[in-house]
């Protein structure tokens, strides 16, 4: 790794990977950006196309089609490779197929001498982040999944639409599995400086029934998009960009990534979406918010589903 030069390697040049790559070049987040794919011609074509966007970016990025050997000097390796979710298929349905692919990818990356941070986006992301941690042997804080960052963004966007407040001023988190058992932390939602419960009590224009419908739309958003256009990629591309910036810029920002629990929230030995502080070292710490009794039960259920699903592939 050259001094002052950030290198990011992207493994997987499908729709998600390329959406992320475009975001990275557009905002000039890293000085070096490497694309790796089993389809080398695709990776080369994407690198060529992206490099032609560099003159319009705020700062130069060197982009090229590389190999796993390029991971040796990488600060961050982002994996989006794997089989995509099909219409009617849950993220957990993908587990056995993508776990096998992942084990091979991670071994190849580690054989290069890689000693940076992993960021995983392939579904089921919580389980594949765990697989990456196990296969890599890296410290838990340097293996991170995209978790519920996108779900939390969808949540804030839809709540913002409902309350007619910009999403940057909606403070709300989705935690748990990135999938069907995720849950909203209603007890800690605030709109601007007002707690959600206070707002509901003050203004009968708003009600919990509407809010519950909003969460269902958040949870099922991927299904709705896949039914209409076949895949989701812009939202997750921006989510990965946000996590990347938090890490490379040493921001100490709080994002709901998939992080390893060892006692937090009463759970152990699982990667799952929780609020975590991210900086140049990866996950600095996991923030434990006090959950309501109902939220605690739902979170425990989410953990249980993940553990049962990943048992056969470990």
UniProtKB/Swiss-Prot annotation:
Q: Which EC class is this protein assigned?
A: oxidoreductase
The stretch of residues making up the signal peptide is none
Q: Which CDD domains match?
A: HicDH_like
Pathway as given in its UniProt record:
Fermentation; pyruvate fermentation to lactate; (S)-lactate from pyruvate: step 1/1
Q: What is its EC number?
A: 1.1.1.27
Q: Recount the known activity regulation.
A: Allosterically activated by fructose 1,6-bisphosphate (FBP).
**GO cellular component annotations, sorted alphabetically?**
cytoplasm
* Residues given in the record as NAD(+) binding sites: 16, 37, 42, 68, 82-83, 121-123, 146
Which annotated residues bind substrate? 85, 91, 123-126, 151-154, 232
Q: Which Gene3D superfamilies match?
A: Lactate dehydrogenase/glycoside hydrolase, family 4, C-terminal (3.90.110.10), NAD(P)-binding Rossmann-like Domain (3.40.50.720)
Reaction equation(s) it catalyzes: (S)-lactate + NAD(+) = pyruvate + NADH + H(+)
What keywords are assigned to this protein?
Allosteric enzyme, Cytoplasm, NAD, Oxidoreductase, Phosphoprotein
Amino acids binding beta-D-fructose 1,6-bisphosphate: 156, 171
Q: Name one GO biological process term.
A: lactate metabolic process
Q: Which residues carry this modification: Phosphotyrosine?
A: 223
Which sites are catalytic? 178
**Principal location:** cytoplasm
Assembly information from the UniProt record: Homotetramer.
Physiological role: Catalyzes the conversion of lactate to pyruvate.
> To which protein family does this belong?
Belongs to the LDH/MDH superfamily. LDH family.
Instruction: State the protein's name.
Output: L-lactate dehydrogenase 1
